């Protein structure tokens, strides 16, 4: 990458909404080609359907401010498994022994409880929840003084794994099903309960779409949290559009932008368009009044059934987990 100058830094969420998700869009100008491009900086990486990891910040993050000159090939965030020398730590050093043991059969292996924490990894799960036409959310995370229909960024879901609960609108039952107290409890039989199969997962990102062209049965009092996030995301996109329009006015035909930045601007324009001027669809279906995307980080600690592999093609399935004091030792106590 060529040296560049940072023109604009835009944060996705203000501190009033979230101070745990440091997502930024950094808009830069290439010092060689004068192309306008952008970096999307977020605290985690997940390019797989599930697997991912938390980034490790480098000292170069101190250079992220407007007007800053960025040297070529500058790295802001990198893998936590990379040493300062540039080498990758792609495994865990463990003592291994091959011997006859009652816990071993075929390709099974015995693993010490003491080393399991060294193999902890993260997966990232995406949940998409649409509602508003026939279903409305319940205030299961709030109380009589606040509305909280889903966990905020940085919150961990409970041991029951519940993320959100939706109830079908019934005009005949509204007098008992749509009271302040009824909003705070769900019925696992009659209500639609959305869960994550991994309890205590952490919410790391939230994205919300609001489609005002759809007919909504949403009680206004249950929309506060939704509106707070939607407003913040809209302001984030408005800043992107506003800066792009400033560039167009100042540079005219000389404006040179990357394909990726152009796509970001289009996305921002769609989100900030006058609500009655555009109909939001997904796979040719008109979106419901609200569509919520939640990204959850799950910490996985290996246990029985997980597979371990070595550097030389050796592998096995953990079939027995033993306390450290029950593991075999040699004459030197190793």
Where are these regions (language model features)?
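Conduit-forming functional cores of very large proteins
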Residues: 1-334
